């Protein structure tokens, strides 16, 4: 029986990395969960193994799972395919031009207070600015990156704006000061507004009648 392309990729991944790898399939796509201490070794294997040949990283981003589940998670859901889940994750999307298939690879930064994973720049040089963006927006540190500095926010920006606990109004704002004849920074003057609608529902709301 002929295997589908997805089945072939799954077979090749297990052959290269071991049968007990943390692999999930959803919506016709494979996601490989990798512990942070194996991140560099596994990604290098994905690129160099002839049966995989993921020579291109087309995207890399950070994710903040601070409010994931909103308290509804069940026991055991702190792990994904056997890999320990934490607040911050790094997700890479890989492409094999030779085999015409794709793979999503995710790792979890073990320390929520100082999230850090290894840089993939030696494996795929094109992730340089992707990792800088994840550092800028999420505060994820990529160990070994040769030029890890902000890339989107302004000089002197405080905080990381894509974190779930970053205030929507920010922390500082800038304006032109006519007396100093230059643009200055000052604490944000926007008053936060929280509007909670008052909803009155019947006791039987949503139940079949």
From Swiss-Prot:
State which Enzyme Commission number(s) the record gives: 7.1.1.-
What's its catalytic activity?
Answer: a quinone + NADH + 5 H(+)(in) = a quinol + NAD(+) + 4 H(+)(out)
| Annotated keywords | Cell inner membrane, Cell membrane, Membrane, NAD, Quinone, Translocase, Transport, Ubiquinone
Molecular function (GO) terms for this protein are: NADH dehydrogenase (ubiquinone) activity; NADH:ubiquinone reductase (non-electrogenic) activity; quinone binding
Report the GO terms under cellular component: plasma membrane
Read off the Pfam families from this record.
Answer: Complex1_30kDa
Q: Name the predominant localization.
A: membrane
Against PROSITE patterns, the record matches this protein to:
COMPLEX1_30K
What the record says about family reads: Belongs to the complex I 30 kDa subunit family.
Instruction: Please name the PANTHER family in this protein's record.
Output: NADH DEHYDROGENASE [UBIQUINONE] IRON-SULFUR PROTEIN 3, MITOCHONDRIAL, NADH DEHYDROGENASE UBIQUINONE IRON-SULFUR PROTEIN 3
Q: What does this protein do?
A: NDH-1 shuttles electrons from NADH, via FMN and iron-sulfur (Fe-S) centers, to quinones in the respiratory chain. The immediate electron acceptor for the enzyme in this species is believed to be ubiquinone. Couples the redox reaction to proton translocation (for every two electrons transferred, four hydrogen ions are translocated across the cytoplasmic membrane), and thus conserves the redox energy in a proton gradient.
Subunit composition and interactions = NDH-1 is composed of 14 different subunits. Subunits NuoB, C, D, E, F, and G constitute the peripheral sector of the complex.
Listed name of the protein: NADH-quinone oxidoreductase subunit C
| Protein species of origin | Bordetella petrii (strain ATCC BAA-461 / DSM 12804 / CCUG 43448)
